[in-house]
């Protein structure tokens, strides 16, 4: 598959950690208030934060032809798919650090990176047996190492890796819509725009020495604690 990547917009020596991006109100008719416990804990490391809602994502969709139509077709009860895709879009458009609302910074990881060379930060999630992967997920042995989508950062706008991920989400959405499934399984949801996208795209670019993006830094998950509430599974 060929991806046409935009030239990134850089700002020299831009730090990652001036503010944390969280997302809320993607669940239709959300009645719960914004959970502040993790936000307050994370202020010890990064004081500022931004709460992103669907209204912040809509204007970005037109950056990718065909995406507004795909977005509109995502069933409302699968709102987590929009949240998964929305986080990629927002950091692609604006740069910055994304964290799930239930993710706590244990130790500031940005003390270990060089903002001049480590332009995209990803975190390991866990390692699984290949036979534990979902039916649609790539079974290449390298994909046993899963990459988190609950935390990632880019210190410039329009990072090519995020564009690759967004375009892969679009391709996968088209596959699901063309399948005319009566119901999307949990494995479909995790695959279509969830952590399997970042995992697959990371390993694909890292497996070819001629295509490896040296600006991507993979960091151990030990810097974070993901509480993994997974409220979308209750839908």
Q: What is each residue range found by the language model?
A:
Residues 1-83, 99-235:
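Glycosyltransferase-associated regions of secretory-pathway enzymes
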Residues 84-96:
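Small-residue hinge/turn detector
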